[in-house]
Amino acid sequence: IYVRPTNDELNYCGDFRELGQPDKKCRCDGKPCTVGRCKFARGDNDDKCISA
């Protein structure tokens, strides 16, 4: 069941710096999110990075 992320969750990926990732960026679809933030939340496998 897909639960619509809250605004906090949407912003989480852009604000969070994940240890071990290049430049400590959050991952989207397994790749570091270096621009903007994750579209969905928290590096889900089907996530994409978006500019925001």
From Swiss-Prot:
Keywords: Cell adhesion, Secreted. GO terms for biological process: cell adhesion; regulation of blood coagulation. It comes from the Eukaryota. The keyword Secreted applies. It is found in: Secreted. A motif (Cell attachment site) lies at residues 42-44. GO terms for cellular component: extracellular region. Potent inhibitor of fibrinogen interaction with platelet receptors expressed on glycoprotein IIb-IIIa complex. May prevent blood from clotting during either feeding and/or storage of ingested blood. Belongs to the ornatin family. This is Ornatin-B.
